[in-house]
């Protein structure tokens, strides 16, 4: 399978062409992170209908996307994780997606 890589000073961001096709949940979550810089499991369920956001985040991390996990509690004490895109990645990820789409 064809792949695309973008080298940066510290990391290589790489993806197989099929792994980030438009319309996949992985791509939808990545674009959500690019637009809003964060996502929670509840958001992913409500917006994209997926209950496995942690698995998609793990896959994105394995491609070199730097995502941090911020553990939080709501007003009722229920714990959840907010996934945050690390600053400075938006341009290189958009470049990768543009190359994949062409």
Question: Model-derived features: where do they sit?
Answer:
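Short amphipathic alpha-helical interface segments
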Residues: 24-38
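Short acidic, hydrophobic short linear motifs in intrinsically disordered regions
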Residues: 38-47
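Short, basic interhelical loop/turn and adjoining N-cap
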Residues: 50-55
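Aromatic side chains
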Residues: 32, 48, 80-83
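Charged/polar, solvent-exposed surface patches and flexible loops
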Residues: 31, 46, 95
């Amino acid at each position: 399978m064809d792949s695309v890589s973008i080298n940066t000073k510290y990391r290589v961001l790489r993806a197989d062409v099929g792994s980030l096709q438009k319309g996949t949940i992985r791509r939808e979550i990545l674009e959500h992170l690019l637009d809003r810089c964060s996502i929670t499991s509840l958001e992913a369920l409500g917006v994209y209908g997926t209950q496995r956001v942690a698995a998609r985040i793990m896959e994105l991390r394995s491609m070199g996307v730097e995502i941090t996990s911020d553990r939080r509690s709501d007003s009722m004490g229920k714990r959840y994780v907010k996934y945050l895109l690390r600053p400075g990645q938006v341009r290189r990820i958009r470049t990768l997606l543009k190359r994949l789409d062409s």
